Structures are given as C-alpha cells and as structure tokens.
Design a protein with these regions (language model features):
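C-terminal motif of bacterial Sec signal peptides marking the signal peptidase cleavage site
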Residues: 14-17
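Sec-dependent signal peptide recognition
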Residues: 2-9
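Oxidative protein folding and maturation machinery
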Residues: 20-154
Length: 154
C-alpha cells in the first residue's frame, strides 16, 4: 500500500513539474544602427554625424533591455565591441574637435544609463572598451588624444 502511495506522489510531482513554464530567455537584439539624415550629402558631414550620433539609440536611457555578462542593453557584447572598433575608425575620419565631442557624447550618455539603472553594464563596458582600444599599447587603434578626452569625463 505504501509503495502505491509513493508511486502516486512521485507521478503527481513529475506531472506538476512538467506544467511549469520554462524561464523566459531573451534573444539578443541587433545593434541599433543609425540612419543618416537625407539632408547630409558630403562624406565629411556624414562622418561627423556618425561620429557624434553613432551611439544615440544604444545609450538611450529609455531603452530597457537585459544586461549581463553576454549582453549590453540587449546587444551581444561581441557585436558591441565590433561596433566600437568601427566607431574608432570613424573618429579617425573627423577632426579632433569633433572626435572630442563624440567621445564626450558617448560617455555622458553611458553615465546617464548607469545612473538610471545601477545594474546596467553599459558604462562599465564602454570603460573597458576605451582602455582596450584607445589606451592599450598593443591596440592598433591606440590613440592617446581620444583616451585623454575619455579620461577627462571620469
């Protein structure tokens, strides 16, 4: 009799366990690329626009997406790193004043994201990327001028 009760209890536990929802998984989003306004015609103006506004959608404080060891504001960290390297390349196409404005813009917006959500890793990720790409002596993109603009924001 006790064996029958035991089997019924185990079967009930298994049936109850099967009915639970699985933890919801978040699918990484593509990087939110910017669209160049149609009024911008010259390549230089386009480079300046991209340099300054490249991160606008990514660092929008209203953007509420998961951030963890693999995701930054919903975007895969690897994808974000590639976009960061691309952005450094764009900075090389503009004058120093524009690059300073672009760097200031990025880090001010990342700081706003961090203040809005202390669990966010947006600011920390950009901090790591600045060290890796702008400051590291082994980086082919190393640029002390860019890093100084970034460090001045800290």
């Amino acid at each position: 009799m006790s064996k029958r009760i035991y089997i019924i209890l185990v079967a009930a536990a298994v049936a109850a366990g099967c009915g639970q929802k699985k933890a919801e998984r978040f699918t990484a989003l593509p990087f939110p690329d910017i669209t160049l306004p149609s009024m911008i015609q010259s390549q230089q103006d386009a480079a300046e626009y991209y340099a300054v506004h490249y991160w606008d959608k990514m660092t929008d404080p209203e953007r509420a997406y998961p951030s963890d060891s693999l995701l930054v504001s919903g975007v895969r960290k690897d994808d974000l790193e590639q976009k960061y390297a691309n952005w450094i390349g764009v900075l090389d196409l503009v004058d120093l004043k524009t690059s300073e404005k672009a760097i200031k813009n990025l880090y001010d917006k990342a700081l706003v994201c961090e203040k809005k959500d202390g669990a966010s890793n947006v600011f920390e990720t950009f901090e790591e990327l600045a060290d890796k790409y702008m400051y590291n002596v082994n980086s082919p993109m190393r640029n002390e001028e860019y890093y100084l603009h970034y460090a001045a924001r800290l």
